[in-house]
A protein has these predicted regions:
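Exposed, flexible binding/inhibitory loops of compact, secreted disulfide-stabilized domains
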Residues: 17-144
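Hydrophobic h-region of N-terminal signal peptides that target proteins for export
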Residues: 10-17
Length: 144
């Protein structure tokens, strides 16, 4: 099952089985430093502060961003194994894959995964947990 399919299933569960389409899924890096975080973004200023540029239409969509790092060697990437959701919680299982060749020295950066989700599935107070495959916590947030 592809990552996009898993995201669509999670969003459908959040929406109470209504038909929902995830518009975009993006991965990349940002030089805005910090630790591991899961964030909900509701406007362009939030994205700009994170150094992320994406075509989010905030009148009808919101973004959820998983940030991991920082790293000082090139080549790290995020792997999202699964996303499960119910009416109270979303659980994301993810980790970062180190570069096979050890990477090259680089300025510090963080990796990110951005999900763009329709506003109609937004539910204030939903808990979003990100854990490793061994169930160690990475980050938690609540939809504000």
């Amino acid at each position: 099952m592809s990552l996009r399919t898993v995201v669509v299933i999670a969003v459908v569960l959040l929406a109470g089985c209504r038909e929902v389409r995830v518009n975009t899924l993006a991965q990349g890096t940002t030089t805005v430093l910090g630790g591991d975080q899961i964030l909900v973004v509701r406007d362009d200023d939030d994205l700009t502060r994170l150094g992320i540029h994406a075509p989010v239409h905030f009148r009808r969509e919101f973004g959820v961003i998983l940030l991991m790092g920082p790293h000082n060697r090139s080549g790290y990437k995020q792997i999202v194994e699964s996303i499960r959701a119910n009416d109270q919680r979303v659980r994301v299982v993810a980790f970062e894959q180190e570069p096979a060749d050890g990477g090259e020295p680089s300025p510090s950066y963080r990796t990110y995964t951005l999900w763009i989700v329709p506003n109609k599935v937004y539910r204030k107070g939903i808990r979003v947990d990100v854990v490793t495959p061994s169930d160690s916590p990475i980050a938690t947030t609540f939809l504000p």
